[in-house]
């Protein structure tokens, strides 16, 4: 159960990082 939650959180963090990178461009 904990692993599933961690994966979900990581996915959300990755998405936020992608948006930030696009803004830097």
From Swiss-Prot:
Residues 1-25 are annotated as: Disordered. It holds the Pfam family Ribosomal_L41. The keyword Metal-binding does not apply. Transmembrane segments: none annotated. GO terms for molecular function: structural constituent of ribosome. GO terms for cellular component: cytosol; cytosolic large ribosomal subunit; nucleus. Keywords: Cytoplasm, Nucleus, Ribonucleoprotein, Ribosomal protein. InterPro entries: Ribosomal_eS32 (IPR007836). The keyword Nucleus applies. GO terms for biological process: cytoplasmic translation. It is found in: Cytoplasm; Nucleus. There are 2 genes for this protein in S.pombe. Component of the large ribosomal subunit (LSU). Mature yeast ribosomes consist of a small (40S) and a large (60S) subunit. The 40S small subunit contains 1 molecule of ribosomal RNA (18S rRNA) and at least 33 different proteins. The large 60S subunit contains 3 rRNA molecules (25S, 5.8S and 5S rRNA) and at least 46 different proteins. Belongs to the eukaryotic ribosomal protein eS32 family. Component of the ribosome, a large ribonucleoprotein complex responsible for the synthesis of proteins in the cell. The small ribosomal subunit (SSU) binds messenger RNAs (mRNAs) and translates the encoded message by selecting cognate aminoacyl-transfer RNA (tRNA) molecules. The large subunit (LSU) contains the ribosomal catalytic site termed the peptidyl transferase center (PTC), which catalyzes the formation of peptide bonds, thereby polymerizing the amino acids delivered by tRNAs into a polypeptide chain. This is Small ribosomal subunit protein eS32A. It comes from Schizosaccharomyces pombe (strain 972 / ATCC 24843) (Fission yeast).
């Amino acid at each position: 159960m904990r692993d599933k939650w961690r994966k979900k959180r990581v996915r959300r963090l990755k998405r936020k990082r992608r948006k930030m990178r696009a803004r830097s461009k």
